[in-house]
Amino acid sequence: MTRLRARVGELLDEYGIPSAVLGVLRDGEVAGFAVGVADVSTGQPATTDTIYQCGSMTKTWTALAFMQLVDERKVDLDEPVRTYLPGFRVADPEVSATVTPRHLLYHTSGIEEDFGDPGEDDDVYERMVAGIAGAAQVHPLGYTHGYSAALGYAILARIMEVLDGKRWDTIMSDRLLRPLGLTGTTTWRAQVDRRRAATGHLIRSREEGPVVTPVDHLPRCFGPGGNVNSTIRDVLTTAHVFLNAGKAPDGTSILSAAGIREMMRSRVPLPDPYMFGPAWALGLIVCDWHGETVYASDGSTIGQNARLRIMPDSNIAIALLTNGGPRETFYKTVFNELLTDLHATTIPDLPQPDRAADLDLSRYEGVYGRPGTRYEVAAEGGKLHLTLTLDPMQAQFLGKPDRVRYELLPVSRTHFLMPSDDPFEDTQTVAIYDFTQGGAQYLHTNCRVNPRLG
């Protein structure tokens, strides 16, 4: 990997990323390397033992532990949540009575992430579930995919707590971390060995370069959906379970082969198939790489990013952990160079815009959003533009104006590319769809669904 190590070093400089750790699991063997520094303010070198925040990759671990309860027949994916949490209630009575764990794993519950501040104590997930009685629906139950960063998996965690009689952090240690030998992996900030931990960084301009983030961790309420910290080896050890019918590297059974198949094969379609893939499975994203099915688990926190790709047909898993910079462009470049060296299938490029697309632009125009997010889509000069309104504090944090305008380039009747003028911002993909009432009813980007507001 000598050539690739040098290449990653060049890319770190190009993208303003302090460090990256790249690893590959092939035929049961792990190899990898680290380049750069864990913290620009100290100059501490990154190593393959450096601990990074994994963000929403956490959901794969939580789903794996939840599926153990399915194996044990303690829970049924298609039974209402109320079967296990009798007092469960959101604003919609029908959703309260019928939403299931499968809806939560699929991100199709439609429940708004309206849970207030449940605090940092051990009962945080119990408090979250108790505090959502007024949570409204973003969309009807099961109608479309709309990513839930924290709430959906917090409800799953509370089910786990009730059935196991322990707090979620203890459950994860008992069910996964210890049996898998994940000695560098933890589920909340207080457990992290700070001497080994990477620091998150932001980059607002090439002149300034990467700077340490002013907020160094997510709140505890994100735990089951985003608070795992891990090393490259531990991430790939977890991937081993999916490539080997539920078995750990030492042969320990983590989940039945049937449970692994269910996690991979139970799927719901994604409105936007281009950023990740065409479907969402149970704790995994389903990708189509030139006809080869690949499973993804991704995560980002404030200034840290984690990417995992599992390739059952090739018996390969690859992972990348970074502490800053753009996400998609960097990881795709690094992964494709690694995959080329491995003579494996590479990641497809985003589609090209259809310059000849004949669209009725008025059907897309409108305001879409959810609490804290607002998108305005407008036609001008025969083109569609999207204006994102940022919270003033978020704009200051990112070094951006309060309103950011993008052109939407059509790929199809419902899909668009959204390139940025900012060299440190990735091109996004956008789906605008559901014309049952004339104008589009939903805008889906970065996995989040935003209903029409006006």
Where on the chain are the PLM-derived regions?
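Short, conserved catalytic-motif segment at the N-terminal edge
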Residues: 1-54, 74-76, 90-91, 125-136, ...
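Hydrophobic (often cysteine-bearing) scaffold residues that line and stabilize catalytic clefts
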Residues: 4, 54, 58, 62, ...
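Short, well-ordered beta-strand elements
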Residues: 296-298, 307-324, 443-445
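Short, small/polar residue-rich loop motifs at catalytic or cofactor-binding pockets
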Residues: 16-19, 302-305, 373
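Peripheral terminal and inter-domain segments
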Residues: 313, 329-454
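Short, glycine/proline-biased beta-turn/loop segments that scaffold the active-site neighborhood
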Residues: 77-92, 180
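Active-site SXXK
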Residues: 5-9, 22, 28-30, 51-81, ...
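Short, surface-exposed loop or secondary-structure junction motifs
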Residues: 29-35, 39-40, 92-302, 307
